[in-house]
Amino acid sequence: RDKNGVGLVKEDLNYLSYLIDWTHANSMEFHVTELNYWLNNENPKSISVQKRQVISYNNVVNTLISKKNNGVVTLNIWGLFDRKGPGDFPKNILSLYDQNGNPKQSLYAIKKSLINESTSLIFEK
């Protein structure tokens, strides 16, 4: 798996798409239950990290939207606020709001995708 996140790797998104199709073909629902963005040793406030989070969330959500007419798809966010990992984990866990409760670009990207029913994916070189 790429260190930057599943939503940034075409092969991972293709596999997600395949899993959703398989689930629907077998008369089951598909649920993403813990979407968040984990970081090791990177500044969670850096522009590059924020941009990767937006693209990753955009791609996961848009993949789900592309499958909505084939069966049930759902998305749950694991925590609303950016936070440190539990225990001795040296990581930051990013979500839709910063630690002060301010909405982040990832929230606006998800809202835009849902409103526009977007299915396009973004891949950077």
Label the predicted regions.
Residues K3-K125:
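Aromatic-rich peripheral "rim/lid" segments of glycoside hydrolase catalytic domains that contact
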